[in-house]
Amino acid sequence: RSILIIMGVPSYFSYLIRNHKEMLIKIFNFKKQINNLYFDSNSIVYDALRILSKEYDTYKNDDLFENELINIVCINIENYINDVKPNKKVLIAFDGVAPVAKLEQQRTRRHKSMLEKKVMNHICGEKNEWNKTAITPGTNFMNKLNTNINNYFKGQEKQYGLEEIIFTGSDEPGE
């Protein structure tokens, strides 16, 4: 039984590539059938944002930018499914509301990030960019992302040759 897991642990994948090259198998040379594919999808949003943010100034407003960002996330997830070709289950999960113990840590990190940004803007001049804190459970962006991802993949099991697609949005508790 084969399971492929794509995780969103910062720097963990690059650590594996550097230190355990023998673990990597090119997916196109992988001969066994993959049954289940699990996505920790927040990293997919950040990957799409990294690419799209270079074009932020070309969008008339944040809604258009966010719609394009969501579209890219859907397409990227779909491409991963098509490349891996699991035959049973796909789980698409986004981080939900964190446990109380972690909320303070996140709040402190966001506050520090905002202060650093203010200092850099003062030194280098203000950059016009989309507010990344929108990638937080409960924001309008994440609610819109939840709805769109759910609608994009809902009832599409046959199209991908799957038994089940499970979506867990950011409105559900847990990480």
What are these regions, as identified by a protein language model?
Residues 2-175:
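Noncatalytic, typically N-terminal accessory segments of nucleic acid-processing enzymes
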